[in-house]
Amino acid sequence: MVGSGGTGAPPPRSSPMTTLYVTQPGSVVRSEGGSLTVWVETEADDPGPNDSPVRRKRLASVEPHRLESLVLLGFTTITANAMRLCMANKIAVSLLDGGGGLAARVVPPEARSADLRLHQYALHLDPPERLIRARAVVTAKLRNAAAVLRGIRSNQASSAALASAITQTEASAEAAAAAVSAESLLGIEGNGAHQYFAGLRTAFVGGIPFLGRAQRPPPDPANSLLSFGYVLLGNRLTGLLEARGVDPCLGFFHDLRPGRPSLALDLLEELRHPVVDRLALRICNLRKIQPQHFEPDAERPGGVKLTVDGRKIFLEEWEGHLARPLREPGVAAEHRLDVHRLLQRQVDRLVSDLRGGEPYRPFRFGTSRPG
């Protein structure tokens, strides 16, 4: 199955730049007539003596200027010519394994900015400046987590566990704002995340339970959804950073690790709960995703992944979710940004900070007052 903008068909000309997801096993992305086409080969039913035993079916054809990224999931491939077409049109290509984990990214030559990266390196090597930004990231993450839990409380019967989780997560946010070292900040973040997920656990009331956050690999359907969503959102942030010439691997809160986009993960922290967790909760509680949409992950023993049909459902919901505005304190409804534009704004804020402008301001989710 192919999803473009989550619809299974190319977006209309008036739509913004989008992502093409290729999920049907055996699909091949080709370059034909200046367009990216997706084909799948299947065995023909009762072929005649002169017929080919293989049937080819075209699933989609998209003009490259309408795309910003291409995501291949599981057993799907891309030809060398199609890859060249993507690079020529500045389309980032991401390869995800069957469980939704990121295997590789292929990106066009970067628009590197030497002065911008020098500023980034200088901040990274300045522990006090790095701590200031790491504190802002973690504080925003925990405040947004508490706001998500308050939203849950307003939409369903509260419980002692949920009320306690809100209080403890808010307390962790205040502690993060006052952290005096990177080590203490890491401990505060871990404790706050534990309290938050204990509260989120009470909100899954559909056919898919959530027993607590677990990963590497995700052992159950709810964790599989969260992990998949985090990969998709982090991948999008990585692409935006690369497009601005920022080094996505040099973060402030997340340490350096080979191949890890630490800066993208920093930006992800303030967004993962308002964006990914709320979507996973909604589609589970509305039973749009059900237990039959998951299967054991053969690539990661003990893990669980979405089936092909499950991925289709999730990606359709995902793209729709990214087009919805998010609440911000003090921002009127008509001025709220959808997730696409919000991500770009946050990257713009970061770039301004790196160039010596206003210190980075993380996204704040929710209303001005708790409750």
Curated annotation (Swiss-Prot):
Family assignment from sequence similarity: Belongs to the CRISPR-associated endonuclease Cas1 family.
Statement: the UniProt record of this protein carries the keyword Magnesium: yes
Tell whether ATP-binding is among the UniProt keywords. no
Give the EC number.
3.1.-.-
UniProt-listed Pfam families: Cas_Cas1
Which terms under GO biological process does the entry name? Answer: defense response to virus; maintenance of CRISPR repeat elements
Protein known as: CRISPR-associated endonuclease Cas1 3
| GO molecular function annotations of the record | DNA binding; endonuclease activity; metal ion binding
What gene codes for this chain? cas1-3
InterPro entries on file: Cas1, CRISPR-assoc_Cas1, CRISPR-assoc_Cas1_C, CRISPR-assoc_Cas1_N
User: Gene3D superfamilies, per this entry?
Assistant: CRISPR-associated endonuclease Cas1, C-terminal domain (1.20.120.920), CRISPR-associated endonuclease Cas1, N-terminal domain (3.100.10.20)
Q: Which residues bind Mn(2+)?
A: 189, 254, 269
Cofactor(s) listed: Mg(2+); Mn(2+)
Q: How does it assemble?
A: Homodimer, forms a heterotetramer with a Cas2 homodimer.
Check the record and name the PANTHER family matching this protein.
CRISPR-ASSOCIATED ENDONUCLEASE CAS1 1
